[in-house]
Amino acid sequence: MREENNFNKNLKALSGFEYNNLRKKLEDLKELREFTFTQGKDNLDINIIKKRNLKKMYQDPIKELEKNLEYFKDFARYPVLFFYGFGNGILYKILLQNQALKRIIIFEKELELIFLALNFIDFSKDLSLGRLIILHHDDINLPKMDKVFRLIGDLFYRSYNLHIANDFYEHYKEDILKLNKLNMQTIKNHNLMHGNDPKDALQGIEQFVYNLPQMITHPSYKELLSKRKGISDTAIIVSTGPSLTKQLPLLKKYASKATIFCADSSYPILAKHGIKPDYVCMLERDEIVAECFNNDFKDFDKDIIFLVASLVHKKTISYLEKNQRKYILIIKGQPFARCLGLDDYGYISGGMSVSHMAYELAENLGHKNIILIGQDLAYAKDGQTHSQGFIHANLHNGDYERDLDRFSTTAYGGNGKVQSSEIWTLFRQIFENFIAFSKSKTYNCTEGGARIESAIEKPFKELCEDLLENKKDKKFKKLQVLNTKEQVKLGLKIYQKIKKNMNLSLNFKKECKKVQKQIHNLTHGKNKLSLEQINQNIDKIKEKLSNKKYLFLQEILGPTLHHEQSILTPLYLKDIKDESDKQNKLFAWIYAHESLIENIIELLEVQDKRLKIAILPLQDFLEKKKAL
């Protein structure tokens, strides 16, 4: 039965790390217990039969294939197609002849059906090129799907549709619904990661530029890594969930044996209990978060380093400097900052929460073991959102009632369910993704709240005794800053680069205005240019935005480009039947870009105004040093 040639070629093509599990299971499969097959005189006439009830997969394999091929003519421009069920594989082999189709992603629960299809057909070339991706049911989880959707590209999420291979797979309805829910959640997470508000992006850019003098006059992230990487094996990340309170006595006992990273909101709580963290982290840009540092703990702050994202609110810096706290500004990997050549001061992706940031820093500093405490990501039984002593507790009144039974998830330890929220669900899923691909061992010792998949659940006391009992007290080296001459040199380089980018932005805006006028003339019957010419000019604008030279604009324009262009996706994918259809589609395509270009112009104008003010502290710094 086995076509050695096809199967072996396909198996070799499943060579990537992601296929390790599937490849091994296919190699170990010695006999078919659930399914068999029949083949007619025609090579396309392959049917599959379930042994238990003799149910056929196809009533007529060739007729069903013809019907499917006719149906998928409307999907000729789609770069990605998703299917549940491998079937006999023939449909996919034919669809892959369309070079516009970049990937087919197949989800299959039955290992034997994957085995059969890989025997029937040679998919080796498409598997090697990644044009065909096979996902066995046992290997599907959130981190895996996150990786798949990153591979696909964001702008085609709106075209996502899970096609069922044929009626045979209706028996897997429950599995299909679960899978579809997982995929939709992954798409939603990716959209949220892009951000949906250019105002947030603008605030981040403005505050980053405003904070530049403080960044270059303090130690760099590179200095931190070079002096302190690998000094300690174990990091404890302290978050502010309701379960934190019960862990504080044990944390105090072992604080000198591990590196303590704490969230900005847990810092006042630790200070109150006399537990000194090594690092206090802050990620968010909002003014209200700065209030976590509006305090004075005197000598307690000695030797603590505050690791804050470079886009934090200016009040954060004021509070840190008021009490002479040591701090480092670390650049998030945003396009505007990356274009300034400040690699020594970055970069962190930071996830979406301060705990994600702390986790990334702990991993980058070489900790082999990372322990999470206070990471509930769920409401307490009494509806509390955070630990006792959380300074913003009043802002969460009514949250429990709002979210009740909407976002419930598996409890820590796997016993029952706990109530969560939409944002905590997203935070948990990001953590699960981080942990799944981390080189460190991650222990969740929260002993409450939600289960975080991939993290090892263990009592905090037991783990401290195992990992920390006989450890010596940690010792950290002091960090150095650039000398004044180097600070001025770097500051001048940044200043000139920002000014250059502001001029590029101004010229780009002028080009956008020209195209805006062309579209306006077209829609008002005054067009001097053909549809093709206007469309080419729109394409030139998009090409410039994808050029490395204009990468700095991706941050302010990113949310708008992502969301507006995802709305354009269905129009882009629409199949063209004839010349009239082509002209109608081209007109609709151009007209649909009018609001996008209008938004681009408005955002560039606002950014220019705000940058002129935000750059003043850097300008003042350089003028005082007589560099300008």
Residue ranges and their predicted role:
Residues 400-449:
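Polyanion-binding loop/helix "lid" in catalytic or ligand-binding cores
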Residues 181-233, 244:
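Aromatic- and Gly/Pro-rich donor/ligand-binding loops
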Residues 80-135:
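SAM cofactor-binding core of SAM-dependent methyltransferases
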Residues 114-197, 271-357, 361-365, 570-628:
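Acidic/Gly/His-enriched mid-domain segments of enzyme catalytic cores or analogous surface patches
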Residues 123-127, 283-286, 294-302, 387-406, ...:
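Acidic, Ser/Thr-rich peripheral helices and adjacent loops at domain boundaries
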Residues 1-80, 88-94, 201-225:
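Class I S-adenosylmethionine
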Residues 437-628:
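Long, compositionally biased charged/polar accessory segments in the mid-to-C-terminal portions
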Residues 266-267, 274-284, 362-386:
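Glycine-rich phosphate/pyrophosphate-binding loops
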